[in-house]
């Protein structure tokens, strides 16, 4: 199992949101690359980056910060937010991003996502509220079940599914292990839990489950409720 510490970018700064609400943003750093470097020092192999402005605009909006992160650390970069076409995918890969997350487009155009997954390192982001898929930066909840969307990408060549329970995101209230497991079982794709990590017990619970391939850690690191160095030791 991997732990993927997260950097959410808004207006060039590292922030965290509560339940995906942009006006809830709390700034943690004016220099996100320094945060990424800290993750590397603590033992991480990955950094999970979300371009929040990009997610709402539908196009890249924090390129300079992403470039700085790439230039200043050796972490593998997983990036999502506002990736809607092949040109953007190619641009980010040329920049040195290792894996790209397709979210809203996976609901609206799954054929496109499957095509991209056959050519590039792609993860599918499934963000859900009460089991239903949310799109467009979580501003809109669809009528599709998250497990049905996961099933759509079984055997499609995607590297991973990143599964976020929006109701828990940024709330430090514990990971929704059952929901994450349901996505993993529906898709048979490596599934990464996101949303709600509070402390080391969440890491232990996800690892013990056996069907969860990774956990994204955000606010728990920034607020100091999870010792990342300790977390890496139990993997």
From Swiss-Prot:
Stated family: Belongs to the HisA/HisF family.
Gene this protein is translated from: hisA
Location of the active site: 8 (proton acceptor), 127 (proton donor)
Subcellular location: Cytoplasm
One Gene Ontology cellular component annotation held by this UniProt entry: cytoplasm
InterPro entries per the UniProt record, alphabetical: Aldolase_TIM, His_biosynth, HisA_bact_arch, Isoase_HisA-like, Isoase_HisA-like_bact, RibuloseP-bd_barrel
Keyword terms of this UniProt record: Amino-acid biosynthesis, Cytoplasm, Histidine biosynthesis, Isomerase
Catalytic activity from the UniProt record: 1-(5-phospho-beta-D-ribosyl)-5-[(5-phospho-beta-D-ribosylamino)methylideneamino]imidazole-4-carboxamide = 5-[(5-phospho-1-deoxy-D-ribulos-1-ylimino)methylamino]-1-(5-phospho-beta-D-ribosyl)imidazole-4-carboxamide
Pathway assigned to this chain's UniProt record: Amino-acid biosynthesis; L-histidine biosynthesis; L-histidine from 5-phospho-alpha-D-ribose 1-diphosphate: step 4/9
Organism the protein comes from: Aliarcobacter butzleri (strain RM4018)
E.C. number: 5.3.1.16
GO molecular function, one term: 1-(5-phosphoribosyl)-5-[(5-phosphoribosylamino)methylideneamino]imidazole-4-carboxamide isomerase activity
Protein name: 1-(5-phosphoribosyl)-5-[(5-phosphoribosylamino)methylideneamino] imidazole-4-carboxamide isomerase
GO biological process: L-histidine biosynthetic process; L-tryptophan biosynthetic process
Enzyme type, top EC level: isomerase
């Amino acid at each position: 199992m991997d732990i993927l510490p997260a950097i959410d970018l808004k207006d060039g700064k590292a922030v965290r949101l509560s339940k995906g609400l942009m006006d809830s943003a709390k700034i943690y750093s004016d220099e996100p690359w320094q945060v990424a470097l800290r993750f590397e020092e603590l033992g991480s192999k990955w950094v999970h980056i979300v371009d929040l402005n990009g997610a709402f605009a539908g196009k890249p909006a924090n390129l300079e910060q992403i470039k700085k992160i790439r230039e200043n650390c050796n972490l593998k970069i997983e990036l999502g937010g506002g990736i809607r076409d092949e040109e953007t995918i190619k641009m980010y890969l040329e920049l040195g991003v290792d894996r790209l997350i397709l979210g809203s487009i996976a609901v609206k155009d799954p054929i496109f996502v499957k095509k991209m997954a056959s050519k590039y390192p792609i993860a599918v982001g499934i963000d859900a509220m009460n089991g239903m898929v949310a799109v467009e930066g979580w501003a809109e909840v669809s009528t599709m079940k998250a497990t049905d969307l996961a099933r759509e990408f079984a055997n499609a060549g995607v590297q991973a599914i990143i599964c976020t329970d929006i109701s828990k995101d940024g709330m430090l209230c514990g990971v929704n292990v059952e929901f994450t497991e349901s996505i993993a079982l529906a898709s048979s794709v490596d599934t990464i839990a996101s949303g709600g990590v509070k402390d080391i017990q969440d890491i232990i619970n996800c690892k013990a489950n056996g069907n969860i391939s990774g956990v994204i850690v955000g606010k728990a690191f920034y607020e100091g409720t999870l010792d990342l160095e300790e977390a890496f030791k139990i993997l």
